[in-house]
Every structure is written in structure tokens, then in C-alpha cells.
């Protein structure tokens, strides 16, 4: 069945608290999607973020981001009582001020923990039994805060850094309240997420999640299971991820994420990946796998190299991993972010897995149309069509900044003149395409310019902060989307 959806992260929702959350605005947006005829809500990775606030550099592949917990919902559920005169952080219409939000939300979550933990203990204990990663993640987060937030390889106590048994016990006792607090936050996040997901699913809306292929160097994952990664005896990465030099970057890109020990994981029957994907399948109905090509072949760069030029391509786990995942998780629905260097091995793996790849309309008008896989005339059914993604400029921003030749190619093919009708033309392009799914960022639905861009790759600061203004998702907008969905048979 042909479907369509909106890409908008939870943090971008409007409302009190300074950041979007799993509160009433999330439910209202689900109502908007239902009215619009949209069957997909795509979000960015939901893990806890730190320096830079990138959802793609999370402290855990399993944990949820406590900043997305709705404190208003905690009050409504009787888990948080505010003092007279105490208020939520006021609504900020357009940008998330992360430091301010974190300070304020931490204060309210600590208060909810002290008021409510005791009454929730039976449920929390069951949560700990069901989600075995939580205990280590809570300890990791408590110790990290204890040492001022420095990355775990720089912790001054060698015992806890290397996870010696006596040190684990010592810190668990010493930081008991903080550990319990972080368990509480995870319990609340997943409780609110489950309620939210049930609401969306009951309206026929599938939650479309996002999963980075790699983990952050400074994460509970590398601290808890260092044997899974290419680390030396001091737990420093031996080699890191990235991509080679190309037309856009003479030095390539060095992402810095530690690489997997794929041979070791093969002998463990890929259990680490099975558990990771099992967690994703609980969170989401569909999972977009970022940098999917890394399963076919991945670029390996020596740790400490000045750039990515000295890296080399290495064969990835390929079909062996996905045979295991198919056996253990037969209902797992995956979309491959297959942007980047396409090789025969990548194409063969995509065919074996059978999952849709991606097409991005704003990538489609540079160079020769016949050789451009993103040119709309080259799209086919087993793809997800996007006007753009979180890493691109908005479509209005793209129209304003594209070079003359590229813009003329788009105007000639899509038949538009100005910015507003151009954005509309791109939206109609993806909705009318043969692709099985079509996804439009909310910024494009609202015809917003570059000021609403979510992320500018290669930059630090100012990213991930866009928020939709209250009242922007109007009935008129929903009605127009529904008319297009009906016209292009996506309802």
C-alpha cells in the first residue's frame, strides 16, 4: 500500500518546557497526521544526547532521551506535584535552548523521582528485569556526572573505567540515589513512549524511527561491552569510521566512531546486534538504518589520523548478519539509508534484505539526469522518496541557494517559477512518485526557509534546535495534505 508521512523530531514540537516532548502536543500532532491522511511519523534517533546535541552521537543505543519526557504528563498522571507558584519553563517558539532546558527538566525529573519512585518500585523492578541494559546505563550516567561529564576513558579512577568488579560495586553503592534516578528516568521515558506509540498505532500511524549504524566513542555501549569494538588495551579506538575523499571533500570525513569487531560478533552469532534491533522493533514500527552501506563494506581509518585519506575499505558482515536478524526478528521492517558510494556488494545486500532504499528529490537535479539515481524519473517502487532530510537545507532554502543550472533543471522538470510554488512542486513530486513511501519534512510542509534547517553537517552549535511554532499545523494545512494524498492514491 502506498503511504506518506512527515519527518519531524519530537524535540521540534511546540509547547511548554522549552523543548518538544511526549505530551499533549505529540498527541495533537498525531491527530493532525490522521486528518492529513499521513500514515507515517518519522523521527530522529531517540537516545540521550550530550555535547553538540546530535541524536546521532548518543550515550546509548538502547536508552531514551529524558529531555523528551513530558513533565506536564507527569503532573497529570499524579507523579509530580509542583510547589505553589512553581511553573514549567515557558514556551519558546522557534529554538531549543538545550542547556537551559536540561537544567530545568533535570530539576523537575529529580522532584518526580523523589515523590514517586517508591510507589512505582514493583513496575521499575520488572522494567529492570525486562531491559537488562538499564542497570549498566544508569551506573554509567551516574559515574559520568560524578566525574563532571568527562568522557569515560578520562575518568580518574582506573577501577571503574576498566569495570573492575569491586569498583562497580563501590560506585553502585556510593552513587545509589543517582543510579536509581537514572533508572527512574528510563522507566518513565519508555512508559510515556509506549502510551504515545499505542495512540499513534490506533490511528493507523506507524512510527518510523532512525538508527545510526555506529555508536559514540563516549557511550555506555563501549564502556559496558568494549570487546564488541576495535579498542586497544587502554580502551582507545584502534580504527574509526568515516568516508573517503570525494568531489565534495578532499580529505574525506572522519566521524570518529569506533568500528565493530565483526569476526568476533560472528562467533557470538551477532547477539549484540540482535538485541539492539530487538530494542528498535519495540520503539518503532519501521527503522531507518543510517549508513546502511557500512554493512556491505565500511571505511576504516587509523585512530589519530589527521584526515580520512589513510583509510581503507573493508568487507562488512553482509548477508550473514541479516540472515540472523531475519531468523530472530522476522517482523522487523527496515529502510536502508543507502546514500553514498554504491558498489555491487551494496546493491546485492539491498536486494537480499529486500528493504526500501532512499531517494532525495533535491539531490536529483545536479549533473546528468540519466546518471543521477536521485533524479525523479529514475525512481521505482521499492524506495522512500523525500523532498529532503534532516541533513539538507529546507526545500525553500535549497531553491534560494541552488546554482542557476541546477535550479533551471528543477524548474523545467517540475514546472515551477518561484519559491512557494517550487516547494509545492517538490512535495507533489514525492507524493506522485512510484515510491512505496513518500516523506516530507514538516519544514517543507510549512514552506520554511534555511532558518528552519535542522542540521548543517560538519558544524557544531546551532543544530538540532528548530521548533515548530504553536498553531502552525492548521486544519487548512491538514486539508491540503489530505487532498494531495487522495489525488496521488496514498490513502
Q: PLM features: what roles do these ranges have?
A:
Residues 9, 15, 53-186, 190, ...:
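Alpha-amylase-like alpha-glycosidases and glucanotransferases acting on alpha-linked glucans and related
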Residues 29, 196, 346:
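Aromatic/hydrophobic pocket-lining residues that form π-stacking "cages" and hydrophobic walls in ligand
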Residues 1-79:
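Trp/Phe/Arg-rich N-terminal binding region typifying the photolyase-homology
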Residues 38-45, 200, 206-212, 282-294:
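Short acidic catalytic loops
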Residues 182-215:
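Conserved, well-ordered alpha-helix/loop/beta-strand core segments that scaffold catalytic motifs
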Residues 34, 193-201, 326, 350-351:
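Surface-exposed amphipathic alpha-helices with a cationic face
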Residues 466, 471-491:
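Terminal-tail/helix-coil boundary detector
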Amino acid at each position: 500500500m502506498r503511504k506518506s508521512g512527515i519527518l519531524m523530531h519530537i524535540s521540534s514540537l511546540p509547547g511548554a518546557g522549552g523543548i518538544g516532548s511526549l505530551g499533549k502536543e505529540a498527541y495533537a500532532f498525531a491527530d493532525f497526521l490522521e486528518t492529513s491522511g499521513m500514515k507515517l511519523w518519522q523521527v530522529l534517533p531517540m537516545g540521550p544526547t550530550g555535547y553538540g546535541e546530535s541524536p546521532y552521537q548518543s550515550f546509548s543505543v538502547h536508552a531514551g532521551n529524558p529531555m523528551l519526557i513530558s513533565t506536564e504528563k507527569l503532573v497529570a498522571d499524579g507523579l509530580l506535584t509542583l510547589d505553589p507558584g512553581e511553573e514549567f519553563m515557558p514556551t519558546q517558539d522557534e529554538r531549543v535552548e538545550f542547556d537551559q532546558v536540561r537544567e530545568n527538566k533535570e530539576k523537575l525529573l529529580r522532584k518526580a523521582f523523589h515523590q514517586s519512585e517508591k510507589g512505582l518500585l514493583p513496575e521499575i523492578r520488572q522494567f529492570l528485569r525486562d531491559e537488562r541494559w538499564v542497570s549498566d546505563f544508569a551506573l554509567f550516567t551516574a559515574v559520568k556526572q560524578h566525574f563532571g561529564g568527562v568522557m569515560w576513558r578520562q575518568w580518574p579512577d582506573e577501577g571503574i573505567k576498566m569495570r573492575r568488579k569491586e569498583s562497580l560495586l563501590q560506585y553502585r553503592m556510593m552513587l545509589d540515589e543517582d543510579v536509581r534516578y537514572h533508572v527512574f528516568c528510563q522507566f518513565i521515558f519508555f512508559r510515556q513512549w509506549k502510551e504515545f506509540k499505542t495512540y499513534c498505532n490506533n490511528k493507523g500511524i506507524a512510527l518510523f524511527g532512525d538508527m545510526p549504524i555506529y555508536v559514540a566513542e563516549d557511550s555506555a555501549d563501549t564502556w559496558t561491552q568494549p570487546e564488541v569494538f576495535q579498542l586497544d588495551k587502554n580502551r582507545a579506538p584502534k580504527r574509526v569510521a568515516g568516508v573517503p575523499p570525494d568531489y565534495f571533500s578532499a580529505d574525506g570525513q572522519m566521524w570518529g566512531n569506533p568500528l565493530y569487531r565483526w569476526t568476533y560478533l560472528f562467533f557470538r552469532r551477532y547477539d549484540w546486534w540482535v538485541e539492539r534491533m530487538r530494542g528498535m522493533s519495540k520503539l518503532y514500527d519501521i527503522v531507518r538504518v543510517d549508513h546502511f552501506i557500512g554493512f556491505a563494506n565500511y571505511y576504516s581509518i587509523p585512530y589519530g589520523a589527521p584526515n580520512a585519506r589513510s583509510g581503507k575499505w573493508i568487507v562488512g558482515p553482509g548477508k550473514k548478519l541479516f540472515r540472523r536478524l531475519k531468523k530472530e526478528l522476522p517482523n522487523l521492517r527496515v529502510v536502508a539509508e543507502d546514500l553514498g558510494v554504491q558498489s555491487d556488494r551494496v546493491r546485492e545486500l539491498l536486494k537480499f534484505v529486500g528493504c526500501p532504499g532512499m531517494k532525495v528529490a533535491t539531490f536529483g537535479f545536479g549533473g546528468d539526469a540519466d546518471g543521477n539515481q536521485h533524479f525523479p524519473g529514475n525512481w521505482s517502487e521499492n524506495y522512500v522518496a523525500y523532498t529532503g532530510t534532516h541533513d539538507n537545507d529546507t526545500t525553500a532554502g535549497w531553491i534560494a541557494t541552488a546554482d542557476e543550472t541546477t535550479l533551471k533543471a528543477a524548474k523545467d522538470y517540475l514546472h515551477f517559477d518561484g519559491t512557494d510554488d517550487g516547494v509545492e512542486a517538490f512535495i507533489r513530486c514525492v507524493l506522485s512518485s512510484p515510491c512505496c513511501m513518500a516523506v516530507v519534512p514538516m519544514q517543507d510542509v510549512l514552506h520554511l526557509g534555511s532558518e528552519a534547517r535542522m542540521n548543517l553537517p560538519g558544524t557544531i552549535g546551532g543544530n538540532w534546535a528548530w521548533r515548530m511554532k504553536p498553531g502552525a499545523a492548521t486544519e487548512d494545512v491538514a486539508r491540503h495534505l489530505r487532498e494531495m494524498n487522495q489525488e496521488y492514491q496514498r490513502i
